[in-house]
Amino acid sequence: GLEVTSIRDFWGLIGMNVPFAAILSVLCWRLQKVGFLTSSTYPIALIAVLAWFIFQTWGIIRTNIELLNGTKIYPKEDRYEFKQVAILELTYIVNFGSELAVVSMLPSFFEFTFDLPKAVAGILASCYAFVNLIARPAGGLISDRTGNRKNTMGFLTMGLGFGYLLMSLIKPGTFTGSAGILMAVFLTMLCSFFVQSGEGSTFALVPLVKKRVTGQIAGLVGAYGNVGAVTYLNIYSLLPLWMGGGKDPSPEIIAASNSAFFQV
């Protein structure tokens, strides 16, 4: 468990562990819906998630037992605010979580929006991940050079939202021909730059929270990216059904749900 320096932060840490158990439970539910978990194994999976949460909570209590019973009081210069960690975790849900989700659905997006072969759609979708080679270290560099890391992270997060909004405008018929595909690829790479620069700027802040527990903080922030990815992908898997596509949605419904997903 992560060491915190106040009772308030202790309860904050407990609270920020709840989404881990919640998203694992949702994942179990989805696996049961698709038939991977049976009616007998589904309850076992939920019990395992509950057992993990209890074990994790006990680890937090054990690490901070001296703080809880009042035998250890941290001096002001040794304290840090857990809300800084929580902000980084929530930011990483937005950037890295959305990256994992978008990478998973982009081939389908290009395939059904432009009626492309699967191989070509996959190649075009790879441009989103390719930008990572430059964008993620650039995010950290920009954060260092500007000197105001919080504002940099906020600006890149807003750019991320604007980029996804632009991508949601790419629908069948709105961008056509080779020029339309090139425009879609350009918008994809532009959006990817903000997403992955945001990831770099987020982790540029991690070592500044508390040096003694930097590794644990980095682990928690990174794990929240997976929470975001599973959340977004669950929404993505349900969008065709919500849009009236039923269990076997048409290509038109899939294309429409792909565009709508970027607005999420």
Regions inferred by a protein language model and the residue ranges of each:
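Extracytoplasmic gate region of multi-pass secondary transporters
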Residues: G15-I44, K83-A129
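Intracellular juxtamembrane helix-capping segments at the cytosolic ends
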Residues: S197-K210
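C-terminal ends and interior cores of transmembrane alpha-helices
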Residues: M158-G177
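Juxtamembrane intracellular "pre-TM" segments in multi-pass secondary transporters
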Residues: G1-L27, T41, L50-L88
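Residue-level signature of mid-helix packing/kink "hotspots" within the transmembrane helices
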Residues: A129-P137, V230
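A membrane-interface helix-boundary motif in multi-pass transporters
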Residues: W29-L46, S237-V264
